[in-house]
């Protein structure tokens, strides 16, 4: 039983690390998309057609949603780890 518990703790620790990495990468992607949206929006006034494709806004919104899901998953994994 001790080996199984130790293995579970090790797996949970790795999952926590990977979720932390995922949070960082997704946050960076969201920030870069927001920067791009801001720049394109500023240039919109100089063009006859909108420069910001709707897909870009959706991608930013989906990244935000993904961040919330990853964060929730990380909290659950941390809680499980503390209870072991």
Residue map of PLM features:
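Amphipathic alpha-helical hairpins/coiled-coils and adjacent low-complexity
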Residues: 2-84
